[in-house]
């Protein structure tokens, strides 16, 4: 059983052991060492539908495969029937079905990998779902890509950074945003592009907003 508490919005590290569960979606399979390390150390490794086949093909052993099962071969479904959880309702996508599967088992700190790449509409939808998971499902979520991490946030958020780290802020509902530790002072951006390509000055960035926003922090090259 995973941990029960809802963690505070202060992301001190991307330590591979920091998560209750890792959800693998059907986008580009990770190649960067950060998401790969998180997957290797996952306490619960949950695949979204066809991502289960990809995981098994690459030698991983998923805890569960969740979705409507419309993208898996009949042979694979038969061979892995004991870990497949079919959810047929169409109100939510497979990423959300997998998230609910994890939260119903007490998981709150969830890392998402393979959620970007391939179809751009899926990428945008998956990133935006981070805010929904944070607000409605009380998940402390991070979405790890091969280039950086997306962090859903609200109110005050502290992030450990390094000097020169590229930081982008996507305002969702704030009428006020300010912060410390960035080269350019953030504000309540009215368009998504306005908050991109900021830069951390040192070892931490603190953001304060009166609503919800998503932060992107690039990895160190």
Predicted regions: what they are:
Residues 20-22, 43-44, 63-64, 82-83, ...:
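Structural motif
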Residues 41, 50-136:
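Acidic/Gly/His-enriched mid-domain segments of enzyme catalytic cores or analogous surface patches
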Residues 132-161:
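Class I SAM-dependent methyltransferase SAM-binding "motif I" and its flanking Rossmann-like core
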Residues 23-25, 49, 113-115, 144-145, ...:
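Short beta-strand segments
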Residues 1-19, 204-221:
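SAM-dependent methyltransferases
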Residues 153-221:
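Long, charged alpha-helical interface segments
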Residues 28-29, 52, 71, 116-117, ...:
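Short acidic/polar capping segments at secondary-structure boundaries
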Residues 2-77:
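N-terminal beta-strand-loop-alpha-helix module at the start
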